[in-house]
């Protein structure tokens, strides 16, 4: 028999899709993609501020159709005839917005801010059917099994990220302080269905048995991730070519992935389709999970640097 568990997955920074049955469907097919965007830049406040922005949209769709016919010749003289057909469609679309702001408050102080926001989604649909017949040593062709696999779903996602840099000179030449901070937040929601049906002829009467093997499941998946990091650096000139650099770095990240699986309340089916019925659906703990990861890292360090036109030497120590 055939069938089994699956469920596609569509991820990406505002533009991405996927999914799969893991069967005969592979790459290739017909793919169309497109993109377009806008860019702009401005000098403001008598040149003290440089501001630029950009927007990009891209999308794609693909279609794959495959068919196979295979004959296996057995040692005893019998033959297995295996036929498969399959189709796959995928669509994606996403938007990206970005800004770059570089502002100089004075010859000694400036900031740089580069935020970006992406959002988008996609959908997929895959279907394959199969049949296997046996030609015995008596030359008679008999039914063995037949069925189909299908999976389909859609997702929505967004990502917000950015970088902030503050730079400050502190009077004495070479004495500086800087702060570099980064952030990233993302979310992806997906609903997908995984269905399969397999019929067999166990008693070899050339009639399909009345109780096919059916998989009829729904998946609700959510992925969230967050990260923050920052690095503070102070530089002090000790002598003409000797500098002391003291730094502190902090980073935090958290990710959570949840997958809830459900079995259909009923299993109504026809030729090439199964209906998922949310009424009476049952949570499937075996294929559900929740994973949480969280990390915090801190580091402090001191570095002595000797710099000349031809040589740079460093000696440092750090603690986590």
Model-inferred region functions:
Residues 1-320:
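Primarily recognizes Gram-negative and organellar outer-membrane beta-barrels
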């Amino acid at each position: 028999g055939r069938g089994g568990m699956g469920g596609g997955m569509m991820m990406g920074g505002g533009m991405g899709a996927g999914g799969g049955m893991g069967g005969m469907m592979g790459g290739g097919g017909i793919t169309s993609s497109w993109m377009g965007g806008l860019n702009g830049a401005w000098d403001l406040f008598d040149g003290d501020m440089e501001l630029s922005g950009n927007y990009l949209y891209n999308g794609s769709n693909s279609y794959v159709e495959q068919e196979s016919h295979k004959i296996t010749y057995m040692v005893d003289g019998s033959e297995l005839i295996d036929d498969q057909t399959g189709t796959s469609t995928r669509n994606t679309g996403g938007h990206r917005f970005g800004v770059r702001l570089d502002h100089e408050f004075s010859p000694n102080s400036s900031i740089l801010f580069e935020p970006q926001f992406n959002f988008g989604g996609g959908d997929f649909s895959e279907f394959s059917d199969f049949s296997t017949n046996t030609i015995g040593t008596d030359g008679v062709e008999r039914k063995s099994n037949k069925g189909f696999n299908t999976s389909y779903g859609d997702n929505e996602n967004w990502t917000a990220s950015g970088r902030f840099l503050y730079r400050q000179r502190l009077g004495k030449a070479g004495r500086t302080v800087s702060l570099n901070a980064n952030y990233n937040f993302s979310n992806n929601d997906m609903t997908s269905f995984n269905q399969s049906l397999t019929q067999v002829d166990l008693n070899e009467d050339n009639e399909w048995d009345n109780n096919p093997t059916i998989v009829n499941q729904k998946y609700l998946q959510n992925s969230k991730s967050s990260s923050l990091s920052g690095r503070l650096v102070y530089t002090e000139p000790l002598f003409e070519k000797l500098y002391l650099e003291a730094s502190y770095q902090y980073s935090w990240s958290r990710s959570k992935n949840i997958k809830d699986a459900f079995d259909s309340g009923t299993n109504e089916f026809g030729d090439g389709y199964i209906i998922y019925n949310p009424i009476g659906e049952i949570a499937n703990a075996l294929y559900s999970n929740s994973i949480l990861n969280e990390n915090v890292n801190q580091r402090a360090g001191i570095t002595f640097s000797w710099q000349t036109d031809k040589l740079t030497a460093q000696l440092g120590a750090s603690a986590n």
